[in-house]
Amino acid sequence: MDKVAAVVAAAGRGSRMGTETRKQYLSLAGLPVVGHVLRAMEASSAVKSVVTVVAPGEENYFRLTVVERLGIRKVAAIVPGGEERQDSVYNGLLALAPDTGIVVVHDGARPLLSPGDINAVVQAAAAYGAATLAVPVKDTVKMAGRDGFVLRTLSREHLWLVQTPQAFRYDIIMNAHRQARQKKYAATDDAGLVELLGRPVKIVAGSYENIKITTPEDLTVAEAVIKARQGRLAEAGG
């Protein structure tokens, strides 16, 4: 398989957490949130190197408090982010080695991914060019107008909630970001930029546990998930 590298986007402000500390540095089961992400990348058999994108000026802080503290060996570069997430990911892409074949993009505030998740999207990207982890919608979804009244109910049959990691052939994701910068358009995720090129993106079924830390309640849920996982491991070992 082509050389696989990851870009971890960890430059977000996290204003909805209501804390001065950026959410990716908050403690989760004894580790920074983003530390769980890097440990999963470290355990992935597919990923060979990681570029982490952090808030400008926090590069050394990140290296000391996360990378060196946790003994992470795959981090090849720590680069400053841009004004928006899309800009930050682009900065990370620019820092990748030129012989990169497949790129994994992941949110630094999504700590519950597994090495298996990473490997699965990498395999799909190698086969199809682009892939994203996602889960089927469970709840009823309604479209509402600006007045707050329901316009219609959407069928759940073909609806998926998109997550990260997402993975792409290097040339595809670089072209998608360059086209976006040139034409000044934006998407809420990297797969969306690839879709705008008219390229197919393969869905890889993920886990409902793979939540993004956005509010204080999410931290509580994530703690519970980690404890449940530890309990299952203890039972399997005992």
Swiss-Prot record:
Record bears the keyword Oxidoreductase: no
Site, as annotated: Positions MEP for the nucleophilic attack: R156, K212
Gene Ontology molecular function: 2-C-methyl-D-erythritol 4-phosphate cytidylyltransferase activity
Function: Catalyzes the formation of 4-diphosphocytidyl-2-C-methyl-D-erythritol from CTP and 2-C-methyl-D-erythritol 4-phosphate (MEP).
Site (Transition state stabilizer): R16, K23
E.C. numbers: 2.7.7.60
Segments traversing the membrane: none
Annotated pathway: Isoprenoid biosynthesis; isopentenyl diphosphate biosynthesis via DXP pathway; isopentenyl diphosphate from 1-deoxy-D-xylulose 5-phosphate: step 2/6
InterPro entries: IspD, IspD/TarI, IspD/TarI_cytidylyltransf_bact, ISPD_synthase_CS, Nucleotide-diphossugar_trans
PROSITE patterns: ISPD
Record keyword Nucleotidyltransferase present: yes
Source taxon at top rank: Bacteria
Family, per entry: Belongs to the IspD/TarI cytidylyltransferase family. IspD subfamily.
A GO BP entry: isopentenyl diphosphate biosynthetic process, methylerythritol 4-phosphate pathway
Keyword field: Isoprene biosynthesis, Nucleotidyltransferase, Transferase
Catalysed reactions listed for this entry: 2-C-methyl-D-erythritol 4-phosphate + CTP + H(+) = 4-CDP-2-C-methyl-D-erythritol + diphosphate
Listed name of the protein: 2-C-methyl-D-erythritol 4-phosphate cytidylyltransferase
Principal EC category: transferase
